[in-house]
């Protein structure tokens, strides 16, 4: 879709906003992307990976929320509570680092216990380095290796379409 926007004409902007709203209505399955605070240190840097992935998913029409436990100073329990209380969430993606890998796995186990219908995916340094640790015993449905901007859309489409098609390179 290409829309030319004139400086004094906001009808094209409204048309584009309508188009995006229609896409959002089509995508009933909400995605939450999250990361937990590390136990080892505290910084005020935002997780750009979550922001990039959110932008890519929203461009494809997904309703995405970021719950950044690290930047928001949220406890693991608060992150878990927000996820479990969201009745629209269908997919949770967890950004994992060496400093929060074990906590991320524990979060996934607890989500799986209470809301087994939620699809769980993870990415980041931990899953890229040792994906088996994250998918072992069905904790996460998928561990993404490397950059996730392309694969997260394909995986999200796969989960929301309940497809039995094969995902390339998985």
Named regions from a protein language model:
Residues 49-57:
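Short catalytic helix/loop segments, enriched in acidic residues and glycine
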Residues 1-22:
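N-terminal amphipathic/basic-hydrophobic helices that include classical n-h-c signal peptides
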